[in-house]
Amino acid sequence: MLLTKEKNGMEIIEERESAVRSYSRSFPTVFEKAKDHLVWDVDGKEYIDFFAGAGSLNYGHNNEKMKTKIMDYVMNDGISHSLDMGTVARAEFLETFNEVILRPRNLDYKVMFPGPTGTNTVESALKIARKVTGRQNIISFTNAFHGMTLGSLSISGNSSIRNGAGVPLTNTISMPYDTFFKNGNAIDYLEQYLEDTGSGVDLPAAMILETVQGEGGINAASFEWLRGIEKLCRRYDILLIIDDVQAGCGRTGTFFSFEPAGIQPDIVCLSKSIGGYGLPLAITLIKPEHDIWEPGEHNGTFRGNNMAIVAATEALSYWKTDDLAKSVQKKSKIIKLRFEQIVEDYPELKATTRGRGFMQGIACGKGKEAYATKICAKAFEKGVIMETSGPSGEVVKFLGALTIDETSLIKGLGILEEATEEVVRQ
């Protein structure tokens, strides 16, 4: 590499890169290589990765099976860029996705390639919902995060993120998420707004939600609430959109995060780990009766990322059996028990545990929010990569690779506990 003692990588980044950068501030080192759940920086320091590319690396860094498929594809001059033209890679993915994911779950969706990122799939979902219903309004939920383009920002909850739009964000309204009220029924509250013609809330084209709010604080909706939302959508002829960009692809223990609730969304948004290897890819799943796009009505240059599609097809092999799902569910219990123990052992945090599957967090209580950032910083010093979540950054957030072995998981959780003790006792 080109870096020398006189040419430090972080100095170059700080000098040359925009002030908008964030993760290089939280994790102030220059990373050089990674494998599975481990990352090494230029000084050779090893880190256990409990961040996994913000949920883009469910199968770990440089997954060997996917790497081999990508390298073979490239070495055989497979088509890398094709917009939405037909390719062997595209056809194989569509067939495998149907056979491995959709058909066993009795789900019937058309697959749309809207672009390479999570916000692309969300934008396409909003557009088709408005086209199908002829309505403009969208109901989203408190503490939601759906992306950084204007449509996605309009349905996100965090005020500082919304303010970055620089223009009014219209035709949306935010309603209380399941965990928003300490006392009271969020479903009843929402239904009153829909029923009362004097509420000022126009009948929406769609409701969009995350079953577990990744950026909003690891708030996990109850299955009862999710079923209640679906029931309202059916009663009022509203489309239900599930944003499974971060919570999907096995992160909660099932391929789709909504499976245990027994609901069937009209539209599903997938990105991040749908690409398997960390390469950019997004898909939008649309019930066939709602797939009323005109050809080319929604398009984009990078819809045909064939190397990502090749990796995505290989990633689906993990779901041909229930081995990975069972492993995630087993290891999730280890995380939950350890987090509960940390909460009990350090009452100074006034903390609670949140989330499910491999999407869990420790939420520091009112007046103690700053502890979360300090704990993550101390954990990084000790060799564990974790980020915070929530409107005040009050949640220590676990997003490790689903494929991490139990020994490494327990080791990383031990380091997190050491970091917590040092921060609390200092």
Curated annotation (Swiss-Prot):
Entry GO MF terms: diaminobutyrate-2-oxoglutarate transaminase activity; diaminobutyrate-pyruvate transaminase activity; pyridoxal phosphate binding
Q: What is its EC number?
A: 2.6.1.76
The Gene Ontology biological process terms listed for this entry are: ectoine biosynthetic process
List every position bearing N6-(pyridoxal phosphate)lysine. Answer: K272
The pathway to which it is assigned is: Amine and polyamine biosynthesis; ectoine biosynthesis; L-ectoine from L-aspartate 4-semialdehyde: step 1/3
Question: What keywords tag this UniProt record?
Answer: Aminotransferase, Pyridoxal phosphate, Stress response, Transferase
Induction / repression: By osmotic stress.
SUPFAM superfamilies under this entry? PLP-dependent transferases
Instruction: Tell me which cofactor or cofactors this protein depends on.
Output: pyridoxal 5'-phosphate
Coiled coil (residue ranges): none
Top enzyme category: transferase
InterPro entries per UniProt: Aminotrans_3, Aminotrans_3_PPA_site, Dat, Ectoine_EctB, PyrdxlP-dep_Trfase, PyrdxlP-dep_Trfase_major, PyrdxlP-dep_Trfase_small
**Which superkingdom heads the taxonomic lineage of this protein's source?**
Bacteria
Q: Which reaction does it catalyse?
A: L-2,4-diaminobutanoate + 2-oxoglutarate = L-aspartate 4-semialdehyde + L-glutamate
Functional note: Catalyzes reversively the conversion of L-aspartate beta-semialdehyde (ASA) to L-2,4-diaminobutyrate (DABA) by transamination with L-glutamate.
Q: What is this protein called?
A: Diaminobutyrate--2-oxoglutarate transaminase
> What organism does the UniProt record list as the source?
Sporosarcina pasteurii
Give the lineage: Bacteria, Bacillati, Bacillota, Bacilli, Bacillales
Q: Which gene encodes it?
A: ectB
